[in-house]
Amino acid sequence: AALREGDLGDGPIRTKDAKEVGNKFGELGMDKVLMRKIYAINATTVLVNDTTGIQNLHETRELIIEAFNDVCKKGPIADEPLTGVLVRLVDAKLHEDAIHRGPAQTIPAVRNAIKGALLRANSVLFEPIQKIRIDAPSEWAGGITRQLITRRGVIEDMPVENDVTCVIGKMPVAESF
């Protein structure tokens, strides 16, 4: 909820702010030590650098964050945005020559690694659900509820006013056509 509301920020996290942001995550029940290594937040998705002793990784920080943001905008399934994911960078092998650590090499490698990890973790595509309200004569209420249930809908309330029944519920968008 704190991520959704933007209480923890959004975008790259400066190194000097990482400890404070990590402490905020700790207050929310997450591993404070891990979250102090935070690189970036993109909506409800977080990138953490959990590596140790990798030389020159700091030189590619911005490129890693850029690749992370690309994946957050277009995830591995149907190019849909990611939501509620913690991405941990646990290892990296960087070329010793700086010329081979540029955007053309780093961004696709990181992007593909994150997408591959997400696919291996059995990512799911959330189904869009719509709220519905149907006002109809009371004698039609049975048919309306039957249709709603056969279309995988959920009835939340059915207030009756005079001879009109109002059916309020939710149902998958794909089932409404």
Spell out what each predicted region is.
Residues 1-177:
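Accessory interaction regions appended to the cores of large information-processing enzymes
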